[in-house]
Amino acid sequence: MDVRRRPVKPLYTSKDASAGEPLKQQEVSSPKASDALPLPLYLTNGLFFTMFFSVMYFLLVRWREKIRNSIPLHVVTLSELLAMVSLIASVIYLLGFFGIGFVQSFVSRSNSDSWDIEDENAEQLIIEEDSRRGPCAAATTLGCVVPPPPVRKIAPMVPQQPAKVALSQTEKPSPIIMPALSEDDEEIIQSVVQGKTPSYSLESKLGDCMRAASIRKEALQRITGKSLEGLPLEGFDYSSILGQCCEMPVGYVQIPVGIAGPLLLDGREYSVPMATTEGCLVASTNRGCKAIFVSGGADSVLLRDGMTRAPVVRFTTAKRAAELKFFVEDPLNFETLSLMFNKSSRFARLQGIQCAIAGKNLYITFSCSTGDAMGMNMVSKGVQNVLDYLQSEYPDMDVIGISGNFCSDKKPAAVNWIEGRGKSVVCEAIIKEEVVKKVLKTEVAALVELNMLKNLTGSAMAGALGGFNAHASNIVSAVYLATGQDPAQNVESSHCITMMEAVNDGKDLHVSVTMPSIEVGTVGGGTQLASQSACLNLLGVKGANRDAPGSNARLLATIVAGSVLAGELSLMSAISAGQLVKSHMKYNRSIKDISK
């Protein structure tokens, strides 16, 4: 095959080949489908378009007349037969002509791409043949040296990945050496591996958080013999987490963020960010948001706003413990205790104190408002101030711990289910009958019955504590991860009871969620990270509200409850309609074998 006959190849003339200079690339047009037409392209296209629409209109009119006159459709006249032949011919032309052009564009592009990556042997062959007709035609006999052509370098479109070599079970993968490490970094890595330099001290010694994380990651790979190639390191501001979010970082985990909504809540629309790896979750919540939206929206009420902390103290006798209980619960002493509690923060305000006795041990529960912060650190500082004051009044009081688990933080507890912790919210909506049928694909009566037997009776049979719902924790966890909340507080924040009732003569559905302990904040912790801060900004609750302290956190709590309402509504409908397994098989199945 003569490679010089290809249309878009940059060739070398005898003159330029001797100088090693390529000619400009010659543009040779590829053959087109229109080249085979006897008439100009625009006339041919117009003819067949006119034929197509004309015969289509004629046939439709004729068939309508046959239907009106009760004439069988298979009885055709000569004119109808010619019209059908013309219709078929025009369809074949239009599909074939434009189809050929469409496919040919890819074929020509493929030929061009394959030409760009042609091996150098064919190119060298052309140069040698052309050079025989130039000044150095007798190069082989006269010793004339023909300079080789410049080598064209083609930049790769994507970075090449190193080939993966299969290892036997007895072999260990060699640690990955990061190319960005300098000789000084290599010495530090060896020091960390040998145990001479503590890994936790790298940030303070180096003064560079990114460099410290890079060195720590490489040292970890060498110590364990395990690769962390899939754990990204670049693209994160490690100085932003120093001393507040994470210690000894070696990278960051990527979690996809989806958007459910718009959620129409209290007359406003919200696009709810959800960080999750569970397929169907965002789609299901989004369907619930749609059902709420077209039904007029949902309404929410904030019932309570107060974070709690309950230290445990011990006396020598139960009588002395009871005396302190009566003292702190006396309304006459509340002002004094409030002054002690509130002095550590301009946002923390003591709301109330309740005590519980277990023998000679006393558990004192402090409740306070915390502004736009979630407030655990804030309330802990206030509690410490009060304990210091009480210890001066009761010298025999022994402080066992600033947290006695009577709070109760990050654990399911009846006290939070009954009394509440953080923000207590109820959210409700009335879903119209036609929405239940068209959007949720089920019936009002079926939803009410399922909710009774599943969320209420079934949960009671299981001895559930705060778990009288379908999957509130799914939505709470996803929103918490996206907005920088403490994911461990999903435990009590997901306490929820879902209620469904037929209203308006049994036609419409009243659905509500009551969540007594939603613990959220818009300042502090993970809320200051760039990604989480962006999600808070999307909801309009980023940072502290200077005009009305605490209003951003309260609004975020109602958005969480509204999102849970949407998620409950959609999942219960899927179960009622028998669509749960089908949807999860479609959207929530892993098709990648990570063991390979």
From Swiss-Prot:
Q: Tell me the active site.
A: E278 (charge relay system), K410 (charge relay system), D486 (charge relay system), H584 (proton donor)
State the residue spans of region: Linker: 104-183
Q: What is its EC number?
A: 1.1.1.34
Any idea which UniProt keywords this protein has? Answer: Endoplasmic reticulum, Glycoprotein, Isoprene biosynthesis, Membrane, NADP, Oxidoreductase, Transmembrane, Transmembrane helix
| Reported tissue expression | Expressed in flower primordia and anthers.
| Family membership noted in the UniProt record | Belongs to the HMG-CoA reductase family.
What's this protein's function? Answer: Catalyzes the synthesis of mevalonate. The specific precursor of all isoprenoid compounds present in plants.
Q: What is this protein called?
A: 3-hydroxy-3-methylglutaryl-coenzyme A reductase 1
**Annotated source species:** Solanum tuberosum
User: From which lineage does this chain's organism come?
Assistant: Eukaryota, Viridiplantae, Streptophyta, Embryophyta, Tracheophyta
Which gene name does the record give?
A: HMG1
